[in-house]
Design a protein with these regions (language model features):
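N-terminal binding-site loop/beta-alpha segment at the start of enzyme catalytic domains
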Residues: 1-102
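Short, well-ordered coil/turn segments that N-cap beta-strands
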Residues: 16-21, 66-69, 92-97, 140-144, ...
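Conserved, mostly hydrophobic/aromatic
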Residues: 23, 62, 70, 83, ...
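Short, acidic/polar
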Residues: 47-62, 121-139, 186-198, 269-274
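Beta/alpha (TIM)-barrel catalytic core signal, keyed to glycine-rich beta->alpha loops juxtaposed to Asp/Glu
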Residues: 150-339
Length: 339
């Protein structure tokens, strides 16, 4: 089964080494998100059926393109439900692709883009119990990895013995791979803390999902350590919620974008930025956050760019001076408007 080889999602279906690009559903399961230009992508069409079809279209394009890892969360609106209906309608069997989801945030926007609060964080045992049941009701045996959503030192989840014991039960019964995701300026600290947590003499967490991109590289060394210790490493926000695309109109970013565009040699500059993440030797899966088929196909092009000699290393050299301090990056990230 897939869970026995967590670094090789969907290997039976790809005829060899699986594509390292995955698909995240944060921008596809709800009307509002913080990606730059998200409202333009959806074009004001927020009807649930329309959004479900859009999600299915992107999932179809991902499957055709060789993607075999899909990531959702309880707080991504109807992302799990949309994924479940796609799996059923396309008759995908459990194990055909890796499915990861998350618990710890509750969606509260009521299908509104302008809600005062879009999600509420709660890492309690009660939330784990409730949301695990909800995820399993939708995804059943398709669910492979269940992750603590945005674990931080402040939330206390990594010191909550009741939660950790409950996660150990999931690990020990073999039903799920237990993972965590990280956010914020202390990602590296959290990743290393997760590496230390054990139950019954064995590491509890088998996967970690963190933000890494050309603007926010601070978790890289810790993720390399996690990879070396055998953890599945998933990269999210490789395009910095659109800040590493042409939608970033900040004049201060213009020189960096011009150089990325030059490096892309006729392709979109974001392809080079995504390829930089794909070329990390410790990154097992890099999630695309595409909300349209067109963006998904452009992201797929980065899988060939990542293998181009010298391309991504040059991008890193050029952008080193534009890399932000973690505190600055996450301050900007928190200020991105829901749209």
């Amino acid at each position: 089964m897939w869970r026995e080889h967590p670094r090789r999602p969907g290997r039976e279906q790809t005829g060899g080494r699986p594509l390292s690009l995955g698909l995240g559903l944060a921008a596809l399961g709800r009307p509002g998100y913080v990606n730059l230009g998200h409202a333009d992508d959806l074009g004001g069409r927020y009807d649930e059926q329309v959004m479900e079809r859009r999600c299915h279209d992107v999932l179809d394009a991902a499957w055709v393109g060789g993607i075999r890892h899909v990531d959702a969360a309880r707080s991504y609106g109807l992302a799990e439900a949309f994924l479940a209906s796609w799996l059923a309608q396309r008759k995908r069997e459990p194990g055909a692709l890796a499915v990861s989801s998350k618990w710890g945030y509750t969606y509260t926007a009521g299908w509104s883009v302008t809600a005062a609060r879009h999600e509420v964080k709660d890492h309690s045992l009660a939330t784990l119990t409730r949301q695990l049941a909800e995820s399993r009701a939708l995804l059943g045996d398709h669910l492979d990895i269940y992750q603590v959503h945005s674990a931080t030192l402040e939330s206390g989840v990594l010191d909550d013995e009741h939660v950790l014991d409950a996660l150990a039960v999931l690990r020990d019964d073999g039903s799920l791979t237990v993972g965590l995701t990280t956010s914020g300026p202390d990602q590296a600290v959290v990743v290393r803390r997760a590496l230390e947590i054990e139950r019954d003499g064995r590491r509890l967490f088998a996967s970690v999902q963190s933000t890494w991109n050309l603007l926010e590289q601070s978790a890289g060394a810790a993720l390399a350590e996690a990879h070396a210790e055998g953890m599945l490493v998933i990269v999210k926000e490789a395009l910095a919620n659109g800040r590493l695309t042409g939608r970033n109109r900040d004049p201060a970013f213009a020189p960096a974008w011009a150089r990325l565009t030059d490096l892309a040699q006729g392709a979109d500059g974001s392809t080079v930025a995504l390829a930089a993440a794909l070329s990390r030797p410790w990154a097992d899966v890099v999630l695309s956050g595409a909300a349209t088929v067109e963006h998904l196909r452009a992201n797929l092009a980065a899988t060939t760019t990542a293998g181009a000699a010298g391309g991504t290393s040059t991008a890193e050299d050029v952008l080193a001076e534009w890399a932000e301090a973690p505190e600055t990056y996450w301050s900007v990230r928190r200020a991105l408007p829901w749209n």
